Amino acid sequence: MASQGTKRSYEQMETDGDRQNATEIRASVGKMIDGIGRFYIQMCTELKLSDYEGRLIQNSLTIERMVLSAFDERRNKYLEEHPSAGKDPKKTGGPIYKRVDGKWMRELVLYDKEEIRRIWRQANNGDDATAGLTHMMIWHSNLNDTTYQRTRALVRTGMDPRMCSLMQGSTLPRRSGAAGAAVKGVGTMVMELIRMIKRGINDRNFWRGENGRKTRIAYERMCNILKGKFQTAAQRAMMDQVRESRNPGNAEIEDLIFLARSALILRGSVAHKSCLPACVYGPAVASGYDFEKEGYSLVGIDPFKLLQNSQVYSLIRPNENPAHKSQLVWMACNSAAFEDLRVSSFIRGTKVIPRGKLSTRGVQIASNENMDTMGSSTLELRSRYWAIRTRSGGNTNQQRASAGQISIQPTFSVQRNLPFDKTTIMAAFTGNAEGRTSDMRAEIIRMMESARPEEVSFQGRGVFELSDERAANPIVPSFDMSNEGSYFFGDNAEEYDN
């Protein structure tokens, strides 16, 4: 495992805090959750939502999006400088769903961004509370990761669509800060860097002048974030090469794609956080629960306990399966899009099935969809056990895995051996062995080839009963290894593309 001494814990990233002890961290994360909850309650009042309507996940998403848009300074500035017809840069809004005469109706609401900012700050004791905004971004990102497979985006940057287990956080906005960087997968970082290098190849001035200097600083920072995710010296040394390149070009793109592939076996450490929709925090705060006083952690039992006691509803299209919709949201809430399905199933206590077998589309409803036939149902977000979220990629061993996703990225700290199809992965490493990174490449390939099952399974704590809040009695589940566990395998999930 990479030395953790120099890194801040998630919660410190989450709250932009300096070194704090566990109690202070739990309190500051709790304070962030309180703020989101208070904001949500106020918005439900403004919008005159009934209790049921306030617990509707689609309404939650609209309200979350409104506040994120109100605080998106870059985009707001851009919109004011480039006015587009029919779009008021000072307003934000979206669809709000209400129950009228036994039917669901869609109502488009519009608010001044200034007003939304005022409500948000008021709910957060006058602060901008960036941590709370980032928290909502990560929830949206986790939902996207669970709903869509990024095949097209991978292919566009020259990567293999089967590397989708590396793509956590690929839809997070750039402004998501340290907490956002922590949850981005290796593939996401590689993709961002490749896009940057391609711009540099196509635009002579990209690295030049005052702007170019800022670009260069951003490039090196992204390289360092990616380097910090790798756990072997050779992978890190290769990242140093990429970062120090005077004029990044195709050689660097090659190196980055090589590194992304290597991460299927020599996995990076990627953080996982359970970020829940605002409509879960709102009712909890309304019922008098004081998150700051009680303390809260995004990586422990707290989100599981909160979901055990929450009622969340969702609109359901005529041919969708409510149980499948529940699975989608459960996975998003637990940041488990790239976890092994056997582990998720064990923790959830009901079978978690691959994306392609789910009869459900995304959670959001498009503006042209017919509301007349729309029903609603309760989302089942409870779990049988809980487990600590991990930030280690674990190691891997030779197991048969599938034709689609060829690896996973563990979410839960649970001991298991990891499925991946070594032959498939190693076949991708033919070709370029010369050039300035040849010795590192050779070393990385050697490590991948010698990955042996016994020394490289994922060592975790195990799962815990929900009554075991102190994580005192780990239960180590045994998994049927004949069954592999990728979520996106042999798959036809919709594409995420704006």
UniProtKB/Swiss-Prot annotation:
What species is given as this protein's source? Answer: Influenza A virus (strain A/Fort Warren/1/1950 H1N1)
* Chain intervals with Basic and acidic residues compositional bias: 8-21
Q: Where is this motif: Bipartite nuclear localization signal?
A: 198-216
Enumerate the SUPFAM superfamilies for this protein: flu NP-like (SSF161003)
What's this protein's name? Nucleoprotein
Annotated GO CC locations:
helical viral capsid; host cell; host cell nucleus; ribonucleoprotein complex; viral nucleocapsid
What Gene Ontology molecular function terms does this protein carry?
RNA binding; structural molecule activity
> Among the record's GO biological process terms, what is one?
symbiont entry into host cell
